[in-house]
């Protein structure tokens, strides 16, 4: 899909998304590819891309009065004719062009995953000292902000301190490092608190998530990429939640766990794992939006 399409051309192909440059806008297409441990898996997960796109749309709509976002439309009829094909319906998003900021904004409301491993070792998560005596999967007294660098495909993101995020941003935007670092930190915490409270009311714990921000044509900080999807977040069922153990999830943690248990898989998943992953994504979508998932 790298041919010219009217006034559109393939700009970027990531682990999961393809981004097309269409004059003054972008079209982001979420494929059914799935990645874990910074590798693209050999299987595709049916309808996954459309679920991610529709879930991002839900959250962009829900938070648009709090922080502006890049979404223009998810209706392919608003996009160039090339995208008026069945394969693009439901999984494509017309977006404003942003100058993306080179920091991934991670917020953690519960201690789990790599954060739990770090805490057990030295009582910190990404250099942030936490209270003693926390249990695995326990809710933190306050959400913590743990930014990281953006790695190229095949490389690993690197956790950085807030101070380091200022340096990274200052290098690209002289005189603006502190301002942008503060704005994206504050926006990340605000968005997380609002959305985590909503999700909890629907039976889902958002343990942690990742946001990406950019600057619009007016230099305003705007949220881009995806928002609060099972790819960018840890979603746990509220029912049965108990600190002190790992939690079942509605996200790709299920895939990560299978890969860890099967190190010789060569990143090829069996059909039942694929089916279970689709079920989990659809269940999360229904709980959060109140609607059965439909691509069209």
UniProtKB/Swiss-Prot annotation:
It is an enzyme of class 6 (ligase). GO terms for cellular component: cytoplasm. Keywords: ATP-binding, Ligase, Nucleotide-binding, Purine biosynthesis. GO terms for molecular function: ATP binding; phosphoribosylaminoimidazolesuccinocarboxamide synthase activity. GO terms for biological process: 'de novo' IMP biosynthetic process. HAMAP family: SAICAR_synth (MF_00137). It comes from Lachnospira eligens (strain ATCC 27750 / DSM 3376 / VPI C15-48 / C15-B4). InterPro entries: SAICAR_synt/ADE2_N, SAICAR_synth, SAICAR_synthetase_CS. Pfam families: SAICAR_synt. Pathway: Purine metabolism; IMP biosynthesis via de novo pathway; 5-amino-1-(5-phospho-D-ribosyl)imidazole-4-carboxamide from 5-amino-1-(5-phospho-D-ribosyl)imidazole-4-carboxylate: step 1/2. It catalyses: 5-amino-1-(5-phospho-D-ribosyl)imidazole-4-carboxylate + L-aspartate + ATP = (2S)-2-[5-amino-1-(5-phospho-beta-D-ribosyl)imidazole-4-carboxamido]succinate + ADP + phosphate + 2 H(+). PANTHER family: PHOSPHORIBOSYLAMINOIMIDAZOLE-SUCCINOCARBOXAMIDE SYNTHASE. Its EC number is 6.3.2.6. This is Phosphoribosylaminoimidazole-succinocarboxamide synthase. Belongs to the SAICAR synthetase family.
